[in-house]
Amino acid sequence: MDDMSLKKGKEFEERASKFLKKQGYKILARNVRYSFGELDIVARKGKTLVFVEVKGGNPDFPPRMRVDRAKLRRLELAAYKYIKDFSPKFEESRLDVIEVLSNGEINHLKGVGRW
């Protein structure tokens, strides 16, 4: 990934984090990396642990379309690993996608995996 893409990705993640905070989420971690995948944002709201994949781009081709089955599987594995490593005691967990669009719009898609 080139420097420009990394910079944009970080910008999208920052905007998504601010959005989540305004919605009452507490950010627990960002950019949790494992050999098989990365969790962009780990947050909690109440008793729910939320793993968030952030995608940014043009509204003409929704960024969520870049989250395919293989990507979802890697995210699920990373989420399971995070839970195992840090043993948080949450009643629920879920996998979300946040789209940060070039027109300024932010879409929060909740519960996108097989969770």
UniProtKB/Swiss-Prot annotation:
> Which is an annotated GO molecular function term of this record?
nucleic acid binding
Q: What protein name applies here? A: UPF0102 protein Kole_1919
Lineage of the species this protein comes from: Bacteria, Thermotogati, Thermotogota, Thermotogae, Kosmotogales
Q: Which InterPro entries match?
A: Restrct_endonuc-II-like, tRNA_endonuc-like_dom_sf, UPF0102_YraN-like
Q: Identify the species of origin.
A: Kosmotoga olearia (strain ATCC BAA-1733 / DSM 21960 / TBF 19.5.1)
State the similarity comment.
Belongs to the UPF0102 family.
What PANTHER family does the record point to? UPF0102 PROTEIN YRAN (PTHR34039:SF1)
Any Pfam family the entry gives: UPF0102
